[in-house]
Amino acid sequence: MGINKLQAFLKGTHEAIIISSEENRRYFTGFPSTHGYLVVTKEEAVFFTDSRYIEAAQKTVKNCKAKLLTKVSEEIKEYIKDRKIIKIYSEREHITVSVSDYLKTAFLPCKVTPSKKL
């Protein structure tokens, strides 16, 4: 499944998918990293990563943009707010309960819904 198939999964412009697992980030972006989040909307995909990886990511990622991430609850939340996202699907099978709980609280009032289809 490529990024375009993730975009097809979304029902509308006010939905997004967040990919946080290392193996799925690498699969979708072509870039190996130990930290980062891939956010996919109907219109675009953005790989948020920290300062250790940003330069290499900007040169390497495929099918998406790379942006610097300093604090998850700020940059990604701002990205979500700017695009009026109200629902985010997250991985269900590939993340820990603590990461899932963190995403649910970090992006309030946006609803984060784990999906086993991802």
Regions found by a protein language model. Give the residues of each.
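A short, polar/proline- and glycine-enriched secondary-structure boundary/capping micro-motif
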Residues: 56-63
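Acidic beta-strand-to-loop metal/phosphate-binding motif
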Residues: 86-93
